[in-house]
A protein has these predicted regions:
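Low-complexity, Gly/Ser/Thr/Pro-rich intrinsically disordered linker/tail segments
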Residues: 179-251
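Hydrophobic h-region of N-terminal signal peptides that target proteins for export
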Residues: 9-17
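Sec-dependent signal peptide recognition
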Residues: 2-9
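Surface-exposed intrinsically disordered loops and tails
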Residues: 50-57, 125-137, 205, 221
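N-terminal capping segments
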Residues: 17-118, 236-251
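...with weaker cross-activation on analogous glycine-rich loops/strands in unrelated enzymes
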Residues: 96-190
């Protein structure tokens, strides 16, 4: 009987572990300020960098400094807050060099952790796939609150895309219209939730944080991801973005 109980725990543990990280992401969202305005300028990026510091054994996140804000910066702060919370409780142990590598820096698209996250196309998904910190997928049915989500407002990836980096909160019916609720920095108000008709979303690429301890491998990946770096000037496709992110190409 004891062996059966142990097997049950081992079978359940992975799903609980994954669910806990979604909960950590949602807790980080709840701790974020609201409003502050939306802006994409060099000053906004400087405020994002100023909002994050590295101590002896943890990140120091002050999101109120990062206002106004933009979408990728907002979701990256949520990721860092989730990691910092786990680091503070001992659930995660990343060394100072890794923490420093994760802090936002003056990086071009595709460079380092932040430069990958902030890039056009599948920035978050590509980073997750490269480091093995979580899985990427396109199924709305598989999505759970606390998943990271890259929304593509039209079927274009790269230099001509229109995208939005968000935290997925769920699908709901609003006045008879199937709608998607998410959190991010949204135009024009900044930090907060938003609901949009699902039909307005051309493509969706989800990323679920599952093994954040693998962020320790950031020092071993190439300094620049050439695919992400290229998306400032060239067009890609959703099929290519999925292939680069370890996702089966949707039909």
């Amino acid at each position: 009987m004891r062996i059966l109980r142990l097997l049950a725990v081992l079978l359940i543990a992975p799903s609980l572990h994954a669910a806990d990280w979604n909960a950590a992401v949602l807790a980080a969202v709840r701790s974020m300020p609201t409003g502050g305005g939306y802006s994409v300028t060099s000053e906004t990026s400087a405020r994002l960098r100023a909002a994050t510091g590295v101590g002896a054994d943890n990140l120091r996140i002050s999101p109120a400094i990062a206002r106004p804000s933009y979408c990728s910066g907002a979701t990256y702060l949520v990721l860092l807050k989730a990691l910092a919370g786990a680091q503070a409780t001992g659930a995660l142990q990343l060394d100072p060099a890794t923490l420093q590598a994760l802090a936002p820096a003056m990086q071009r698209d595709g460079q380092g952790a932040w430069g990958r996250w902030n890039a056009n196309g599948p920035g978050t998904a590509r980073l997750f796939h490269e480091l093995g910190v979580g899985r990427n997928f396109t199924s709305w049915e598989a999505a759970r609150p606390g998943d990271f989500l890259k929304i593509f407002w039209r079927d274009a990836v790269g230099s001509d895309e229109r995208g939005h980096s968000v935290i997925f909160l769920g699908v709901e019916n609003r006045d008879g219209v199937e709608s998607v609720r998410f959190w991010s920095s949204n135009k024009p108000d900044g930090y907060g939730e938003k609901v949009v008709p699902k039909a307005k979303i051309a493509r969706a690429l989800f990323s679920r944080l599952e093994q954040p301890e693998r962020f320790a491998g950031i020092a071993r990946v190439p300094a620049v991801d050439p695919y992400l770096a290229s998306l400032l000037e060239r067009r890609s496709s959703f099929a290519e973005a999925c292939a680069k992110s370890g996702v089966a190409v949707p039909r």
